[in-house]
Regions:
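Signal-transducing coupling segments at domain and membrane junctions
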Residues: 101-130
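A short, aliphatic-rich beta-strand micro-motif
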Residues: 129-138
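Signal-transmission linkers at sensory-effector interfaces
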Residues: 1-28, 179
Length: 181
């Protein structure tokens, strides 16, 4: 069963990361392990890790995994999410998710009310029909984001157990930052 396999891969990745966090670890290695576990466990098409760029007060794409990521370095570079937007600015879905710090699954990004909230950079460069956003926060402020997508609308289906493991993975990434911070 697909969900059982996903749970096994996620749980095993979490265990590896836990062991890594006990040793003298390199932050980037832990982050890559988190992305790799997500990518393999849930068969995402692409995953991208974004980190706060203090000068710009926005999140920018740092690295990713998946279909075409190497040939599409432009894909990772495309991610630019403002952390503070003027109230009058059009409601950018990514900015809103990061400001609220809420895990968000967009089942069908082609739906009109969703599509009109997707930023121009996303529509031009990324343009996935379904995606998941997992913000990373410390002291109530989002400082990073994990993005994951698939190639068909409504194709990201998560059981409660998978969702719980995803959150654990995200929390491990936050812990890694706290320990190096």
């Amino acid at each position: 069963h697909l969900h059982d396999e996903a749970v096994q891969v996620l749980a095993s990745g979490i265990e590896d990361i836990t062991n890594q966090l006990v040793d003298n670890f390199k932050l980037n290695e832990v982050l890559r392990m988190v992305l790799e576990t997500l990518y393999r466990g849930l068969h995402f098409r692409r995953v991208v890790f974004c980190l706060r760029e203090p000068k710009l007060d926005s999140l920018t794409g740092r690295f990713g995994l998946g279909d075409d990521i190497e040939s599409a370095k432009g894909l990772v570079a495309a991610f630019k999410i403002p952390l503070h937007t003027a109230a009058s600015a059009s409601v950018d879905l990514f900015a809103a998710v990061c400001q609220r710090g809420v895990d968000t699954l967009i089942a069908d990004a082609t739906e009109h009310k969703i599509a009109e909230r997707l930023p121009a950079w996303y529509q031009a460069k990324v343009h996935a029909p379904t995606f998941l956003l997992l913000p990373l926060a410390m002291k109530g402020a989002t400082f990073a984001l994990i993005y994951a997508d698939k190639g068909h609308p409504n194709s990201i289906e998560l059981s409660e157990r998978e969702l719980s493991l995803l959150r654990t993975l995200r929390n491990q990434a936050v812990m890694a930052f706290k320990q190096t911070g």
